[in-house]
Curated annotation (Swiss-Prot):
<dbReference type="GO" id="GO:1990806">
    <property type="term" value="P:ligand-gated ion channel signaling pathway"/>
</dbReference>
<keyword id="KW-0112">Calmodulin-binding</keyword>
<feature type="topological domain" description="Extracellular">
    <location>
        <begin position="108"/>
        <end position="121"/>
    </location>
</feature>
<dbReference type="GO" id="GO:0016323">
    <property type="term" value="C:basolateral plasma membrane"/>
</dbReference>
<dbReference type="GO" id="GO:0045762">
    <property type="term" value="P:positive regulation of adenylate cyclase activity"/>
</dbReference>
<feature type="region of interest" description="Required for generation of inwardly rectifying CRAC currents">
    <location>
        <begin position="3"/>
        <end position="49"/>
    </location>
</feature>
<keyword id="KW-0325">Glycoprotein</keyword>
<feature type="compositionally biased region" description="Pro residues">
    <location>
        <begin position="41"/>
        <end position="50"/>
    </location>
</feature>
<comment type="function">
    <text>Pore-forming subunit of two major inward rectifying Ca(2+) channels at the plasma membrane: Ca(2+) release-activated Ca(2+) (CRAC) channels and arachidonate-regulated Ca(2+)-selective (ARC) channels. Assembles with ORAI2 and ORAI3 to form hexameric CRAC channels that mediate Ca(2+) influx upon depletion of endoplasmic reticulum Ca(2+) store and channel activation by Ca(2+) sensor STIM1, a process known as store-operated Ca(2+) entry (SOCE). Various pore subunit combinations may account for distinct CRAC channel spatiotemporal and cell-type specific dynamics.</text>
</comment>
<keyword id="KW-0472">Membrane</keyword>
<dbReference type="GO" id="GO:0042802">
    <property type="term" value="F:identical protein binding"/>
</dbReference>
<dbReference type="GO" id="GO:0002250">
    <property type="term" value="P:adaptive immune response"/>
</dbReference>
<feature type="topological domain" description="Extracellular">
    <location>
        <begin position="197"/>
        <end position="237"/>
    </location>
</feature>
<feature type="region of interest" description="Disordered">
    <location>
        <begin position="1"/>
        <end position="50"/>
    </location>
</feature>
<dbReference type="GO" id="GO:0017156">
    <property type="term" value="P:calcium-ion regulated exocytosis"/>
</dbReference>
<keyword id="KW-1064">Adaptive immunity</keyword>
<keyword id="KW-0812">Transmembrane</keyword>
């Protein structure tokens, strides 16, 4: 009998521990996972936000809306302050200019003592000048009294300082000064220009026997007789021309003032409707917030 052949030598060392292969394969798997995904030292992901119930969501929405409403109210107050300041500045400049011009026009006008003025012309001219100066000085007085207080508040860089401004309480006085300076004062100024033209040019007329330096005496007499027969002197013609020009300008001014006022009122009305809609939305949210405990909520009614 032949002896049995020895088994072939094994490539693996039987004396090596079995745990070595498992540790090597585990390190390979860990390196593979670390190479494929995030590094092993990365912080864990934050937990998802907790579910918000419907009453809590209503409360958060209401607080956010009220915060936005507070900021919008402050912005609206600042816009009103800047608008009031601009109106007062424009009123003061316009009133000072037009009243000064009216005073100079009344003082510098030279009346012809030899001319027989119509009885009502000088009275109307004097009354118009006096009312014009009084209206503009009243608007200038309001602007001078209120404007420094508004300027002092507008120069302070603080959002809450708008409450210290008197523009809300003095709103009617500001609008009155604006109307006196821009509407009534401008119309009186146009009338003042027309009356000044009549007072200045009405005495100008050519004498019947006065020769003209550029024409022969015979021709001057013919022209003078023609002007006397027509009944319109050169001064009257100049006054009538100025009146014919100023009357359409006054009508255009009145139409523009009415159109501007209607457009401004329409814009303010639209803004009031928008604010009323916002207040209705606030009231709805407040009502839902007040009655959130009256309705029983199921556990599944959540907003993620």
């Amino acid at each position: 009998m032949h002896p049995e052949p020895a088994p072939p030598p094994s490539h693996s060392n039987p004396e090596l521990p079995v745990s070595g292969g498992s540790s090597t394969s585990g390190s390979r798997r860990s390196r593979r996972r670390s190479g494929d995904g995030e590094p092993s030292g990365a912080p864990p992901l934050p937990p998802p936000p907790p579910a918000v119930s419907y009453p809590d969501w209503i409360g958060q929405s209401y607080s956010e809306v009220m915060s936005l409403n507070e900021h919008s109210m402050q912005a609206l107050s600042w816009r009103k302050l800047y608008l009031s300041r601009a109106k007062l500045k424009a009123s003061s400049r316009t009133s000072a200019l037009l009243s000064g011009f009216a005073m100079v026009a009344m003082v510098e006008v030279q009346l012809d003592t030899d001319h027989d003025y119509p009885p009502g012309l000088l009275i109307v001219f004097s009354a118009c000048t006096t009312v014009l100066v009084a209206v503009h000085l009243f608007a200038l007085m309001i602007s001078t009294c209120i404007l420094p207080n508004i300027e002092a508040v507008s120069n302070v860089h603080n959002l809450n300082s708008v409450k210290e401004s008197p523009h809300e309480r003095m709103h009617r006085h500001i609008e009155l000064a604006w109307a006196f300076s821009t509407v009534i004062g401008t119309l009186l100024f146009l009338a003042e220009v027309v009356l000044l033209c009549w007072v200045k040019f009405l005495p100008l007329k050519r004498q019947a026997g006065q020769p003209s330096p550029t024409k022969p005496p015979a021709e001057s007499v013919i022209v003078a007789n023609h002007s006397d027969s027509s009944g319109i002197t050169p001064g009257e013609a100049a006054a009538i021309a100025s009146t014919a020009i100023m009357v359409p300008c006054g009508l255009v001014f009145i139409v523009f003032a009415v159109h501007f006022y209607r457009s401004l009122v329409s814009h303010k009305t639209d803004r009031q409707f928008q604010e009323l809609n916002e207040l209705a939305e606030f009231a709805r949210l407040q009502d839902q917030l007040d009655h959130r405990g009256d309705h029983s909520l199921t556990p599944g009614t959540h907003y993620a």
